[in-house]
Amino acid sequence: MYHIFQISGEVIKGLGLKTKILITIVFSTLLILSVMLLSFSNNFNNKLFAATINDESETPGRDRLIGGLLTADFDEGSCLSRYHKTFLYRKPSPYKPSEYLVSKLRSYEMLHKRCGPGTKAYKEATKHLSHDENYNASKSDGECRYVVWLADYGLGNRLLTLASVFLYALLTDRIILVDNRKDIGDLLCEPFPGTSWLLPLDFPLMKYADGYHKGYSRCYGTMLENHSINSTSFPPHLYMHNLHDSRDSDKMFFCQKDQSLIDKVPWLIFRANVYFVPSLWFNPTFQTELTKLFPQKETVFHHLGRYLFHPKNQVWDIVTKYYHDHLSKADERLGIQIRVFRDQGGYYQHVMDQVISCTQREKLLPELATQEESKVNISNIPKSKAVLVTSLSPEYSKKLENMFSERANMTGEIIKVYQPSGERYQQTDKKVHDQKALAEMYLLSLTDNIVASSRSTFGYVAYSLGGLKPWLLYLPNDNKAPDPPCVRSTSMEPCFLTPPTHGCEPDAWGTESGKVVPFVRYCEDIWGLKLFDEL
């Protein structure tokens, strides 16, 4: 349309002065009106959005602070998910945080504000890290002690270990600082008001980051084995190795005797890829405190995850848009999370068979009707069910979609199948991939029921955030669907996949770790430990 407004130089020259002035006034007026219209549109949209938020905030039964779990000291617009997650959930969580946990979190926030990055206390605490002298037992480093979390492995692992390390910080009055070299800062809002949990990039010990492993000279497990650490002389920092390949010596860090020594070290560096919370209950001192924090023992990650993890606005926009477009209008929502632990990922028929077998046996999805049965009108007003599938492979959702679109089912339900993405392979540390992964974890947590793959940290995060007790798909063996295909968990807690084999005290060394305390038992579907309320 630009050519309409083109006027040749000759025509311009031929116009009178008054005409030129008139044209200038007209165009100027149009320009001003356009700017005003755009401004009005933006203001209108902002007011409309604010009105929507206010309406949500006034919705009866919706507790924006989640029983005091969250503080009100944040600006809502800077992180929309923080206070508005509850408005998307199918119903308020029946699991309420204890008053003791709420009080502990408020105290922690004050401590983090005093000791966090940029404070005088932080600057003082980092002075001693430039040289590797040993500390004397009498030496004090002030009130601030720290635990640094290093980002490792996939997003599910990272969120589980972040919650684990934060709980350890709560129990030991340490400040948690988060490795800022990866994309955590691009995915999650700051959880503590008036400060930051992101480790400054100039932190002295980060120049050794690639060297933190079992062979590192300040690795606690290695120092134990070499008898090179004692209660009178200890280094200014220790590295805690809590990965899937941890040794027994590495796994002793949580024990009471070891903690009395570790407690004197001002800086701890944590590398972990497992949810080690269950082992903290083996320490009698920790156990007393944990019981007060979490009277309902299976709510640890449910509460800590909702306190710590608030997707940034860009991620939250993905969640809310997809939820409203595809899931919000359904009478019921079913989540199916599929992870194949093989070098060659992709679609496997025996996995598809297992998913169908589990969902139909457990009455989560209806069986298909025969030709005769399909002629029977089951219901005048059929119920609608949205099935949300998350997988690296899109074939699973396509097979389910075809299955229910081509034939009638026994209940007459309207089954709609959705899959937000199918990226074929995991792309950890790629910002867009991790944003999608986080969004899909939250979408799964918004479902009414969930079926999840055994051993999948992605699934652990989703159903624990949502307060859901999942149906866990057993690991297939020899390319065959297991029978039974799945088991209903009696706990919503994640599984600690590489736990210690025994408790802390010598009299417990002959006792299997799943029998040391009654509420820390073996996971239903795979070797590991998890927390249970039901005895």
Swiss-Prot record:
User: Has the keyword Transmembrane been applied to this entry?
Assistant: yes
> GO terms for molecular function, please?
alpha-(1,2)-fucosyltransferase activity; fucosyltransferase activity; galactoside 2-alpha-L-fucosyltransferase activity
Task: List, alphabetically, the GO terms of the cellular component aspect.
Answer: Golgi cisterna membrane
Those parts of the protein on the Lumenal side are 42-535
Membrane association type: Single-pass type II membrane protein
Please give the biological process terms from Gene Ontology that the record holds.
cell wall biogenesis; cell wall organization; protein glycosylation; response to salt stress
A Pfam family that the UniProt record links to this protein: XG_FTase
Q: Which residues lie on this side of the membrane: Cytoplasmic?
A: 1-20
**Gene3D superfamilies reported for this sequence:** 3.40.50.11340, 3.40.50.11350
So which domain of life are we looking at?
A: Eukaryota
Residues crossing the lipid bilayer are 21-41
**Which residues carry attached sugars according to the database record?**
136, 226, 230, 377, 409
Keywords, A to Z? Cell wall biogenesis/degradation, Glycoprotein, Glycosyltransferase, Golgi apparatus, Membrane, Signal-anchor, Transferase, Transmembrane, Transmembrane helix
**Where does this polypeptide localize?**
Golgi apparatus, Golgi stack membrane
| Tissue localization of expression | Expressed in roots, stems, leaves, flowers, siliques and seedlings.
Pathway participation: Protein modification; protein glycosylation
Annotated signal sequence range: none
Q: What is its EC number?
A: 2.4.1.-
Q: What does this protein do?
A: May be involved in cell wall biosynthesis. May act as a fucosyltransferase.
Q: Which family does it belong to?
A: Belongs to the glycosyltransferase 37 family.
Full protein name: Probable fucosyltransferase 4
Organism of origin: Arabidopsis thaliana
